Amino acid sequence: MNYAYPDEKGHYGIYGGRYVPETLMQSVLELEEAYKEAMEDEAFQKELNHYLNTYVGRETPLYFAENMTEYCGGAKIYLKREDLNHTGAHKINNTIGQALLAVRMGKKKVVAETGAGQHGVATATVCALLGLECVIFMGEEDVRRQKLNVFRMELLGAKVESVAAGSGTLKDAVNEALRYWVSHVHDTHYIMGSVLGPHPFPQIVRDFQSVIGNETKKQYEELEGKLPEAVVACIGGGSNAMGMFYPFVHDEEVALYGVEAAGKGVHTEKHAATLTKGSVGVLHGSMMYLLQNEEGQIQEAHSISAGLDYPGVGPEHSLLKDIGRVSYHSITDDEALEAFQLLTKKEGIIPALESSHAVAYALKLAPQMKEDEGLVICLSGRGDKDVESIKRYMEEV
């Protein structure tokens, strides 16, 4: 398969690009230049790997979920344990890389957006480590849902700005973070949390997250002597999925499955299934599939999981859908909750609600596969942050 994206203008087919105001263009170009240089610099790579190994705790285990496998019948189920990273999710793979890049560029301050709070915590964490000032924008609704993560960020020295505009969720937090970046661009780096935004952000985030798929490939071959037949990951903006999928894109014998949030059902207005129900548009500096109405107004995305309710999806996922290399599906709130409880009871692992969407789809997929086949789930994060809201949800039901 001939796959080499993005092109030199930052496009993935028709998607991606740089739809930014003139005031930001210079910074985006400067970032691209700095990033290219850093990736070719052995000292930078060495420093990054040092922190990934000794601070983040990589490599993360590839765990054979024997009880889940027995329960499902069919394929052997493996879990890539990104929940065991420092701060409890895949987010830190990207924040540590971008923070080192910020230091390299001479920036003193970092701004970021966060939905579930995981990216905010991971950003505040690396800023504490590297002595950078940190400002985090978070939607009002998410601040309510994720009180503990807000407190964590503040403990780590970050300033958390609550965003009341719009729906008070991730999309609005990104708007404010971009606005802040425009006016503080001389001394501030924006750490985008997913494979979104203007080029080079989708590429930078993908490359820093690719450690997930690269490790998985190596570990699976050591365990089974071949590549897995299927790989499953959840998708909000799509960074854990892109990090898992990208190293497998050329291995066409490996089926790739991305799982979005169907919320209350894709037949309702309350979902975040952008690739299933969306259409092409521009948001936050990039062309991608979006949830929008006929007038092109962005629609509210809904998911029980704060990390999946973004109304867009990364440009590279948009392309991978169009060319058919990745198969995209959606899972409802209820199905995700069921999978959350099942994995907890069967394996003693409490997954994040985001990751539970991937687990739920894998539960449908595994029984359709043969016993000598393997299925890897990217367990993108741990569920400590969700226990309170799940308790509330179950009491209401």
Curated annotation (Swiss-Prot):
Name of this protein: Tryptophan synthase beta chain
NCBIfam families: trpB (TIGR00263)
Homology family: Belongs to the TrpB family.
Role played: The beta subunit is responsible for the synthesis of L-tryptophan from indole and L-serine.
Family annotation (Gene3D superfamilies): 3.40.50.1100
Keywords, in A-Z order: Amino-acid biosynthesis, Aromatic amino acid biosynthesis, Lyase, Pyridoxal phosphate, Tryptophan biosynthesis
The protein's annotated pathway: Amino-acid biosynthesis; L-tryptophan biosynthesis; L-tryptophan from chorismate: step 5/5
Oligomeric form and interacting partners: Tetramer of two alpha and two beta chains.
Enzyme Commission number, as recorded: 4.2.1.20
GO cellular component, one term: cytoplasm
